[in-house]
Amino acid sequence: MFSPADNIFIILITGEFILGILGNGYIALVNWIDWIKKKKISTVDYILTNLVIARICLISVMVVNGIVIVLNPDVYTKNKQQIVIFTFWTFANYLNMWITTCLNVFYFLKIASSSHPLFLWLKWKIDMVVHWILLGCFAISLLVSLIAAIVLSCDYRFHAIAKHKRNITEMFXVSKIPYFEPLTLFNLFAIVPFIVSLISFFLLVRSLWRHTKQIKLYATGSRDPSTEVHVRAIKTMTSFIFFFFLYFISSILMTFSYLMTKYKLAVEFGEIAAILYPLGHSLILIVLNNKLRQIFVRMLTCRKIACVI
């Protein structure tokens, strides 16, 4: 029998799962159809398509992990099951982080202006090497997830502790302790791509400041297209920073949940908050991307007309 908190958790996480799949699936479908029609795809759409596929995987793994942990806490007594879940989560998490970083760096290189030779070389090269960069993201994520699987496979201490516990609730709390160090370590590794995104963000803000300063010399009373593009990209990157910070804090909360009296409630809250990252940022991308937003508005308009008819 589920408690009221469990019922609320299931309802919320199911709603997030549906919205996440629909939102990310919409981006992938629009870009795929556009690719088929034009026989080619832009670099930003190519990165976005790979990103939303990674996010669909991440959302799916997080939902499965949340439901399994909360509704079947004795999963921690079965080493292989927990290792499989954590390995897939690590892979999807890192793949999502690195591709998002690629998107942020791409925005910076394409929108910002600079006369630095390295910047100009990267700006020229990015379109030609994006396939290899994304392949590198896949390879890094796969390598880290395999290392995570090996580390957890070598750590059987939690099984030795859990098998002496008769109460499943106690088992849930105690068996997470050995995962503290690996979880914390792999969470900290995710800071690396985030720092790269943060650097790109500040450099883009600096570029906007310099551009705005130049525009003031030729004040026209309205923003020029370049300024609008700068602002839109900064909004996208700001939303990423916000949602990733929420995701990171939620991951830390779940990692330390075994120290809390209401650990089960902490895990439920952490899972719900963490899923907002791959869900919320993708919805922001739809709103700020002209093509995605216009197609969505046309779909809603056609639906309203069909309902009236």
Swiss-Prot record:
Main location: membrane
Localization (cell): Membrane
Transmembrane stretches, start-end: 8-28, 51-71, 83-103, 132-152, 185-205, 240-260, 267-287
Membrane-side (Extracellular) residue stretches: 1-7, 72-82, 153-184, 261-266
GO molecular function, one term: G protein-coupled receptor activity
Glycosylation sites: N167
Keyword Transmembrane helix among UniProt keywords: yes
Gene Ontology terms: biological process: detection of chemical stimulus involved in sensory perception of bitter taste
One cellular-component annotation, GO: membrane
Membrane topology field: Multi-pass membrane protein
Record carries keyword Transmembrane: yes
UniProt-listed InterPro entries: GPCR_Rhodpsn_7TM, TAS2R
Cytoplasmic topological intervals: 29-50, 104-131, 206-239, 288-309
Keyword annotations of the record: G-protein coupled receptor, Glycoprotein, Membrane, Receptor, Sensory transduction, Taste, Transducer, Transmembrane, Transmembrane helix
Family: Belongs to the G-protein coupled receptor T2R family.
Biological role: Receptor that may play a role in the perception of bitterness and is gustducin-linked. May play a role in sensing the chemical composition of the gastrointestinal content. The activity of this receptor may stimulate alpha gustducin, mediate PLC-beta-2 activation and lead to the gating of TRPM5.
Further facts: Most taste cells may be activated by a limited number of bitter compounds; individual taste cells can discriminate among bitter stimuli.
Protein name: Taste receptor type 2 member 8
Organism, as annotated: Pan troglodytes
